[in-house]
Amino acid sequence: MVKNKNAVKGLLVLGGVGTAAFSVYTISKKYAKKLLYRHHKQEDRPSILEAKYSSKNITIKNDQDIQLRGILIPKENPQETVVILHPFGLQAKDMQLYVPYFEEHLPEAQILLVDACAHGQSDGYIRGFGIKDINDLVCWNNYLLDTYGKDHKILLYGKEQGANTILNAAGKHVLKNVKAIISDGAYTSPYDIIGYRLEADYKISKYPAISIIARHIKKAVHIDLKENTAKYVRHNDIPTLYFHAKEDEFVPLKMVYPLYNKNRGKKVLFVLKDEKYLYELVENDDFKQTLSQFIKKYMK
């Protein structure tokens, strides 16, 4: 009788474990779909970009014939362009507060803010995680050179996933006439940052959830979340300024060090001690001077 009771208890425990495991699996698959797919396209609302900077929309097609939207702040006879790439889940217009800083440092340059595939007003419903977005960045790169000439200078600025897209592309040597890169808050890999956010945002242990999420996304669209940007920057020969806020609330500071240390080419690392964003910098901030010197050196 005692053995039977113990057997029943054992089955109940196993049943509980099985239910918990099933729950983690189900939640992880739902989260994977939430990350992977855009379920509706946001309305394109007016912003300061049109009102203050007389911006205009431009569109191109990527290699999969998906239409991509960019917002261009034009200049007369431009010799250089700053391209701004946004983080995961945001859109080009969310980066409008960064425009004044590039206007200040490169007043003659036009500025192109890009909506990633499946973000903002770009078409598509499958997100690229900074991996499939590489080819789209190449399309924008080619568009600028085809439109303004092969000697047109380009500076790339990316925030979080935007930064990873740029660094990955630079390491693959698929970019042309890019004179400098500014990487803001880049992470080591999608796998690492998603696992970190699971624990920080949802209080869920990243294992086995992140493994389930990664398997589902790889099976669905052949994107490997373990693609590590540190692997790519070993081959990056474009001058790169890495900066990261010490108190970054989304990407932990520790993730920038493997990228900086592995980067082969000319590089600068700057950790913001107080501010969290580029547009919060004050006039006498040390980083503002570092940024100015970096831009002048490589965009001259």
Regions found by a protein language model. Give the residues of each.
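Short beta-strand/loop motif that positions the catalytic acidic residue
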Residues: 235-236, 242-244, 248
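Hydrolase active-site cap/lid region
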Residues: 168-222
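An N-terminal hydrophobic leader/cap segment in hydrolases
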Residues: 8-61
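Short alpha-helix in the alpha/beta-hydrolase fold that links the catalytic acid
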Residues: 98, 238, 252-261
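Conserved alpha/beta-hydrolase
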Residues: 99, 103-123
